[in-house]
């Protein structure tokens, strides 16, 4: 994921967590906030409740991969908070949950205007 598409600062995370809308799924919680930019930015939070470092990193990889293939509307800051089962599921299941959450928030884009997070 490109640097421009990531939330990196504590203030950015705090703002989304405090003022953003909340959407709850079985594997992740999603917080969203409009950012008035030409792109959407995403951040991930995986606590130690998920497991050790290996499990936490796996959960983040699965979430990133789910977003890589999914189109988003522009102009949103999104934070995904992984739940305890997130590290044990297959990527297809997480992708289904992520698309469901994005659809509930009406951030899931049509194919003609999508912003996908392709890696370089």
From Swiss-Prot:
Q: Name one Pfam family in it.
A: Ribonuclease_P
Name the PANTHER family for this protein: RIBONUCLEASE P PROTEIN COMPONENT (PTHR33992:SF1)
Query: Per the record, what are the reactions this protein catalyses?
Result: Endonucleolytic cleavage of RNA, removing 5'-extranucleotides from tRNA precursor
What is the name of the protein in this document? Ribonuclease P protein component
Q: Which family does it belong to?
A: Belongs to the RnpA family.
Record GO cellular component, one term: ribonuclease P complex
Q: Which NCBIfam families match?
A: rnpA
Q: Quick one: which gene encodes this? A: rnpA
A Gene Ontology biological process noted in the UniProt record is: tRNA 5'-leader removal
| Molecular-function GO terms, alphabetical | 3'-tRNA processing endoribonuclease activity; ribonuclease P activity; tRNA binding
The EC number(s) given in the record are 3.1.26.5
